[in-house]
Each structure stands twice: as structure tokens, then as C-alpha cells.
Amino acid sequence: MDFIAGEILYFNKPLTWTSFDLVNKFRYKLSRKLKVKKIKVGHAGTLDPLATGVMIVCTGRATKRIDEFQYQTKEYIATLKLGETTPSFDLEKEIDAVYPTEHITRELVEEVLKTFVGTIQQIPPVFSACKVEGKRAYELARKGEEVELKSKTLVIDELELLECDLPVIKIRVVCSKGTYIRALARDIGKALGSGAHLIGLERTRIGEVTLDMCMSPEEIDDFLEQNVVKIEEEK
């Protein structure tokens, strides 16, 4: 494999790792193996630290294709806890409000999910990488500053209820670029006349790339050992 000319690799990001952690670890190991000081490495779509799953990583000149992958549809398996909200809409922050769930039934959940299929408007979470006047929203939010984000037009292609063990539900989401599953959880909770936050998230597909095609960070060393071409210096 020619990592400088450009390769496209698939990883399964572990829980608690940032997307940068994964890219940084691979870049470090790759540059050491190639014995070069610098090599371009980038990813095609951020995953939150509390999410796991598919990440596409590009090297060398293949980093020019990152936008192409970012615009492909993505599939997620999300687990939502109904009746409770957090400022981050996931487990990163503590529960800040509790809502009733006694009125929620499986039938109501299925009816509400149908209303989110198609073109929707979504306001991103304030704890996100969206920019506000040149600054990341999460940087402002962590300082306690008020952050106002504009809604974005998104497309939800599929939304399926996989499990319903109230107040916990598990859903499968197929969506367009820019969709925040945390924000979707918030909006589903509101539509149910309650609240909700994410307690689990796995990205299972980007375009045609599925989880079973991905390697774990623990496999990087063996992968590089097998795929870095040892080129002898010409004398």
C-alpha cells in the first residue's frame, strides 16, 4: 500500500476516544513505520467520544476525497432514555430535568418516529463543533455563554424502532450529512410529550462501508507490518 500517494482505511472508533485520538494514533504509528516526519491523515466525519463505530480515515493525497465520503448517507443504532434530559443530550453531562413517561406506549413511539422521516429541520446541540462567529459552539457553552444556533435542513431516510423496553428505546437511523443523533433524541423526546437523551450510539455504516469492514486501533500495528512496503534506498 502507498500511504503517501493515498489510502482509504476503515476503523471502528472505541468508546471515549475522540475522532482526533484515533487519527492521531494512526498518524503517529504510520509516520514511525514509514520513517517520515509528516504525512497527511484525516477523517471523513466526526464521532462523539461517547459514540462508537465506523470512521473512514484517509492518508496522503486521498485526503482530497474526504468531502466525497462526508456526503454519503450514514446509519446509526441509537439507544435513548426517555423521561430525562441532559445539557449535552447524551451521558457527557448530568441529568438536568425529569419528565413524565407514563403516557408513552410502543404505538405512540412508532407514530412519532414516522413524523421524523423525510426532510426535517434540526437545531444542532450547543455542545457541538458548529461554529458561532468563528468559535466552536462547545467552547462557548463550556464557558457558560449563551449559544444560539440556527436550524439546518436534513434528510432522515429511514427511522426504525428496534427495541422498546420503556423508558428505553433503541432505533436505527439512516440519515444525511450533518445530522446530530443527540439532537434527534432531544426532538423525539419532545414530540413524545416528554424528554430524552442518548445513552448509546454506534455508527454502523458510511455509504457502503460497514462495521465488519473496519479494524480496531489494536490491529494497527499488525496492519502496518503487513502493508507498509519496505523500500530500500537506491545506492
Swiss-Prot record:
Its EC number is 5.4.99.25. Pfam families: TruB_C_2, TruB_N. Keywords: Isomerase, tRNA processing. SUPFAM superfamilies: Pseudouridine synthase (SSF55120). The keyword Secreted does not apply. The active site is at D48 (nucleophile). CDD domains: PseudoU_synth_EcTruB. GO terms for biological process: mRNA pseudouridine synthesis; tRNA pseudouridine synthesis. It catalyses: uridine(55) in tRNA = pseudouridine(55) in tRNA. InterPro entries: PsdUridine_synth_cat_dom_sf, PsdUridine_synth_N, tRNA_psdUridine_synth_TruB, TruB_C. GO terms for molecular function: RNA binding; tRNA pseudouridine(55) synthase activity. Responsible for synthesis of pseudouridine from uracil-55 in the psi GC loop of transfer RNAs. Belongs to the pseudouridine synthase TruB family. Type 1 subfamily. HAMAP family: TruB_bact. This is tRNA pseudouridine synthase B.
